């Protein structure tokens, strides 16, 4: 997705546009979801700025690209139904990658307190933002 400008000069008065020039309130659920997806993408970017193994880096970049595509679909509403199969396949691929990585480490038996290392803390933050976006989408 290419953005020409980051401002519109239209004076939004609490409104914004979805694709197709549909005007909605800035607290519309489409905008809330896009904000959460954008926040998740930013947290993943912070995580990628850390020392991440190449297999994890590949999965994170793949997730970032999917988040951009999902955000575009959310604001285009009508196209979303047509593209859900694409995201279902991509989700399965990401889950498969996560399963492989999970099998490479010993998993604790209970809940994990956020923290430890900076990448671990960012991973926990990404998880919580992702769960919020998921709740908003459903």
Please tell me what each predicted stretch does.
Residues 1-138:
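Phosphate/pyrophosphate-binding loop motifs in nucleotide- or prenyl diphosphate-using proteins
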């Amino acid at each position: 997705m290419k953005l020409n400008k980051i401002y519109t000069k239209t004076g939004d008065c609490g409104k914004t546009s979805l694709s197709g020039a549909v005007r909605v309130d800035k607290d519309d659920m489409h905008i809330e979801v896009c904000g959460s997806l954008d926040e998740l993408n930013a947290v993943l970017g912070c995580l990628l700025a850390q020392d991440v193994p190449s297999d994890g880096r590949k999965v994170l970049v793949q997730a970032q690209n999917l988040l951009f595509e999902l955000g575009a679909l959310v604001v285009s509403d009508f196209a979303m139904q047509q593209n859900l199969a694409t995201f279902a396949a991509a989700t399965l691929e990401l889950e498969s990658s996560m399963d492989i990585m999970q099998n490479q480490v010993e998993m604790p038996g209970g809940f994990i307190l956020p923290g430890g290392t900076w990448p671990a803390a960012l991973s926990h933050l990404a998880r919580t933002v992702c769960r919020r976006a998921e709740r908003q989408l459903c």
